[in-house]
Structures are given as C-alpha cells and as structure tokens.
A protein has these predicted regions:
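Sequence-structural signature of mature extracellular/luminal beta-sheet repeat domains
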Residues: 1-321
Length: 321
C-alpha cells in the first residue's frame, strides 16, 4: 500500500483531542529527553555541551551538568539512575565518547564503558535498558569520520558485570541511531538512519534473548528516501513513536518526502498517523507526567510537549505501564 505521508493524521484514541503541541522551553540543539517519576525532564543541549532540566509549569530551564561530554541520548534505568551517551558530534576534545551513569540521589558519576577492543567509541548516541540491568547503546559516527578509532558503527550491550559486547554491526545495519525495547523487553527496536544516497532509513526489530542477544532481524518500517527516524519511544500497547521527517529536502540523499513529526507505527509496520511538529530537526521523544500520557519531543532548538491517550512505557516506571 502506498502512503501519502503528507496527509497522514492520527485516528481517535492516540493524540488527545484539542491538545496543542506547545513549546516547553527553547535552547539550542536538543536531544535525549528523559522524565523522572516526579516530573523533572532531563535533556541534552549538545551544541552548548550541557545537560539541562525542565520543570513542567516553570518557565525556562536549569543547568544540570556543564560540560556534559557532549551528551546526546539520556535514559533513566530501572533504578532511576541517569544513563548518558557522551558523544563526539563536533569531533573535538570535549566529546566524552563514553557511557556514564549518574546516581541522582548522590550525584555520583560512574563510567560504564569508554572503549571496545582497546579503541575509543565513535560517539555514543542513544540508549535502552532492561529491568534486569542490561544496557544497550548505539555508537554511530555522524561527524568527522577521520576521528574514528573503530572501523565500524555498531550496537553494544553492557552487562551487569561490566562486560561490553558488540551485538550488531555492519553490514547487517549501517548507521545505528535511536534504540528502544518493547514493553515485555523481548524485542529490540533500532533506528538505522544513514544520510547518504540509498542509505538505510529503516526501523528494525530484533528478537532479544534472555542473555541479550538479538536475532530475527526484520523491517518494521522504511522511511526512504526521506529523512528517517532519530530517537523513539514506545507506549504501553507496544506502538512506536518515532521522531522523523524534515520540512524541506536536503538534497537527493535526504528528501522532503517525510514531513516532520512524531510517527506512530505499530510493531507490524502499520502507520497509525503522525503528530505534526513544524520545526526541523526532531531528534528524540519520551513519555512522562503522572499518567505517562505527556509526550516530550526534543528538536533543533525547542523542547515540545503534548498529550496523548495511550500511556507510555518507560523502564523505570514499568510497574505503572
């Protein structure tokens, strides 16, 4: 079936009727929102090398960490600790190129991983975590590839004993970006977004074994030739909420075929619709609020918020989903 992506809306039961998509706060180039049980939203300001916080109902933001190691994707693990992908988007010395975990109660920061086979990571981008403590993160290079020590863009697993295992790499995938789990934690979803002509713009699904090994690779959705997905979230029914699209073509390698918004897609690849957001470029999305029905969307310079009908699933509040 051919879909006219520019005319797709969401049916009743997904986006709350009359709910505006409103700016929560505006900064620079934003990524990786993560929302605590109390409602505090952590998000990355990559360009200014900071992790910021936003309190709903309060104008503006607070600085949580500066410098942040060019932090990108953020996630609260099953114990409510803040996982951070410290990247290298600018190809300079401020990029941490590592995974860290912060105990928000004590402020203690722990380096979980900074290399593989003795070589520094490219630029950790996004992260997912199981309730058993396993952590999965993507490590692409979207910046200066001459800074790479590794010769591949891959997905890794950090086990509770601290060991690091490469679980996905080229040629099965090209440029891993957003990553998430299904509510039962048995499916791993991966955004493979390679912005070159004929590069992947796919959402992959993998079966995930108890020990954290992915298998059974299959396509959920292909956004080609438009701007594919970046980050994503999952609701309690298993639907994917993918930040994707762009309002105008960047050239033949990334066309304007996919308009910007949060694309709601079932695990079987059925497009339920789109929450339109006019700003380029949407980067990531998460659920928050008392009822997990508040959606926070990071974009080029604005953190947006809107309301949805189906509560989200996040690992640190899995008992509520």
């Amino acid at each position: 079936m051919t879909i006219d992506h520019h005319s797709v809306g969401l049916p009743a039961g997904y986006h709350t009727a009359e709910a505006d998509v409103a700016p929560a706060t505006a900064v620079a180039f934003l990524e990786g929102p993560a929302c605590t049980v109390e409602g505090l939203v952590y998000f990355s300001d990559i360009a200014n090398n900071r992790i910021l916080t936003y309190t709903p109902g309060v104008e503006g933001f607070e600085v949580f960490r500066e410098p942040s190691g060019r932090a990108n994707g953020l996630l609260l693990d099953s114990q409510g600790r803040l996982l951070a992908c410290e990247g290298n988007e600018h190809g300079d010395d401020d990029g941490g190129r590592r995974m860290t975990r912060t105990d928000l109660a004590t402020g203690e920061v722990e380096i979980l991983a900074d290399s593989f086979d003795g070589k520094r990571f490219n630029a950790p981008n996004d992260v997912a975590a199981r309730s058993n403590g396993q952590i999965f993160f993507t490590d692409p290079c979207y910046g200066d590839r001459t800074t790479m020590e590794l010769d591949h863009d891959s997905v890794y697993r950090i086990d509770t004993d601290g060991s690091v295992t490469r679980v996905l790499t080229q040629p099965e995938i090209q440029r891993p970006n957003g990553i998430h789990l299904s509510p039962d934690e048995n499916t791993l979803y991966l955004v493979d977004s390679c912005p070159v002509i004929d590069g992947n713009r796919k959402i992959w699904a993998f079966d995930l074994s108890e020990d954290g090994t992915p298998s059974g690779q299959r396509v959920v959705y292909d956004f080609s030739p438009g701007r594919g997905g970046d980050g994503m979230a999952v609701d309690s029914q298993g639907n994917l909420y993918i930040a994707a699209g762009i309002s105008r073509s960047r050239g033949p390698h990334e066309t304007g075929d996919i308009p910007p918004g949060i694309w709601v897609i079932t695990p079987d690849g059925d497009v339920k619709g789109r929450i339109p957001i006019v700003e380029d470029v949407l980067t990531n999305v998460t659920f928050g609020g008392d009822d997990l029905k508040t959606l926070y969307v990071a974009s080029g310079k604005t953190l947006f918020t809107t309301r949805v009908e189906i509560p989200g699933w996040v690992v640190h509040r899995r008992a509520e989903s």
